[in-house]
């Protein structure tokens, strides 16, 4: 019985990781020069969109889940724009792409969307529930502080460990 449960768990995890696995396979397999004359970053965007459309079309993801994943993509893209900005320069996307905005290729948001897809899929497949959730105002406040720290840690200090302690504390 334990082996069967372990196998079921593994299959659900694999299923939850479907978008992540396919997208990162593309990241590793698409050559730096791109495919069929399409620059690499643009090819990655096409692959990510194709995977996402296929998952919705086959019913592996719902339209409501797609909306949440799009939110992860938008937030992630905004974070990438900040981290690659002229004042920060944490990293860069040096290769050419037709689908760059503010120096950031649109595919980059799918790295965050992949995490969102996994969370949403795992939540549904494992029928997860949160018990003893803190009041929404507390959750909202800690989320705002975490994002504020992300943007301001270069100027006022890094408070991520204090924020983690607050988020995990009782």
Regions of interest found by a model, annotated:
Residues 1-170:
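Aromatic-rich, lipid-facing transmembrane alpha helices and their immediate juxtamembrane interface loops
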